[in-house]
């Protein structure tokens, strides 16, 4: 980590360093939508009308992928995400700078208050901090990210 820092790279995510953060990665960690194209590809799509969030998974085999593609059967590979709060926290807490309260509400469709009791527990354990509507892991929380994420399970 010191060698990367001395070379101008900063850690912006638990497993990523860069001179500037990767926008693709940031979108993923901020629970944004992305389209999976091709054999074995994964995607995440939000249906604006129903407020449902879907994960998509394409068949790994190129032959099976082409069969599905020729049927134009998007629904068969889409699964509704049941626990949006946990999925959001699982992703966003990986970011060193955390996330904004409004982002949580926009991406999950839930009021931020649904997190209150779990945030209180994480704060009591010195794993998370809240500053100006921004939630981020403390240094301890970043070092013990699995334990922090488990609180929101």
Predicted regions and their residues:
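C-terminal scaffold of the Radical SAM
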Residues: 1-110
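Short secondary-structure transition/capping segments
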Residues: 22-26, 125-128, 143
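Short, amphipathic alpha-helical interaction segments positioned at domain boundaries
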Residues: 140-153
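Basic amphipathic alpha-helical segments that dock to polyanions
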Residues: 104, 115-125
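Minor-groove-contacting beta-hairpin "wing" of winged helix-turn-helix DNA-binding domains
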Residues: 134-138
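Hydrophobic alpha-helix feature that most strongly marks membrane-spanning transmembrane helices
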Residues: 94-98, 109, 120, 127, ...
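A short, conserved structural fragment
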Residues: 13, 123-133
């Amino acid at each position: 980590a010191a060698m990367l820092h001395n070379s101008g790279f900063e850690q912006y995510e638990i497993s990523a360093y860069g001179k500037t953060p990767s926008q693709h990665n940031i979108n993923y960690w901020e629970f944004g939508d992305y389209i999976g194209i091709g054999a074995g590809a994964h995607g995440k799509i939000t249906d604006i009308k129903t407020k449902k969030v879907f994960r998509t998974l394409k068949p790994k085999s190129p032959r099976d992928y082409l069969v599905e593609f020729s049927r134009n059967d998007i629904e068969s590979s889409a699964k509704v995400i049941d626990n949006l709060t946990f999925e959001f926290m699982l992703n966003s807490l990986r970011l060193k700078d955390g996330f904004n309260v409004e982002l949580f509400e926009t991406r999950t469709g839930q009021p931020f208050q649904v997190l209150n009791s779990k945030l209180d527990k994480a704060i009591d354990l010195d794993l998370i901090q809240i500053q100006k509507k921004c939630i981020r892991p403390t240094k301890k929380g970043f070092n013990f990210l699995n334990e922090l994420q488990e609180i929101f399970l």
